[in-house]
Regions:
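N-terminal first-folded block
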Residues: 1-24
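Solenoid-repeat scaffolds in large eukaryotic assemblies
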Residues: 25, 32, 76-79
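Amphipathic, charged alpha-helical scaffolds that flank and support histidine-based chemistry
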Residues: 66-80
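Long, amphipathic, charge-rich alpha-helical segments that form helical bundles/coiled-coils
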Residues: 52-69
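Amphipathic, coiled-coil-like alpha-helical segments
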Residues: 76-95
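Amphipathic, heptad-repeat alpha-helical segments
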Residues: 29, 33-40
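Helix-capping and short linker residues that terminate individual alpha-solenoid repeat units
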Residues: 18, 37, 44, 88-91
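Short, solvent-exposed, charged loop/turn and helix-capping segments
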Residues: 38-55
């Protein structure tokens, strides 16, 4: 569910940036950053081992990308694509 919400927030930020709606874009970016922080906080390093460490690195890289390039729609799309890949991987694991 958090991956879906993260994808929605990023899509909203992209649409707002493309439409020149800076306030709306900033709001969606803040939401995306908050979701990434929640995903990271939910990692169980004791039980998750290497997977948790890898996901932590991915989440932090995404957070850095959002922080460093908040106005770059191409970079936002890259993060959104990465989230979509993660979501698909989790769906495949539980299927």
């Amino acid at each position: 569910i958090l991956y879906e919400e993260l994808q929605n927030a990023l899509a909203g930020a992209i649409r707002a940036r493309e439409g020149g709606q800076d306030v709306a874009a900033n709001s969606q970016m803040a939401r995306a950053k908050s979701i990434l922080a929640a995903l990271e906080a939910g990692l169980d390093f004791d039980r998750g081992g290497t997977l948790a460490t890898t996901l932590c690195g991915i989440y932090r890289a995404m957070q850095r990308q959002l922080a460093n390039t908040p106005n770059d729609v191409e970079k936002l799309n890259e993060v959104r694509s990465g989230v979509a890949n993660l979501a698909e991987s989790w769906r495949a694991l539980v299927a």
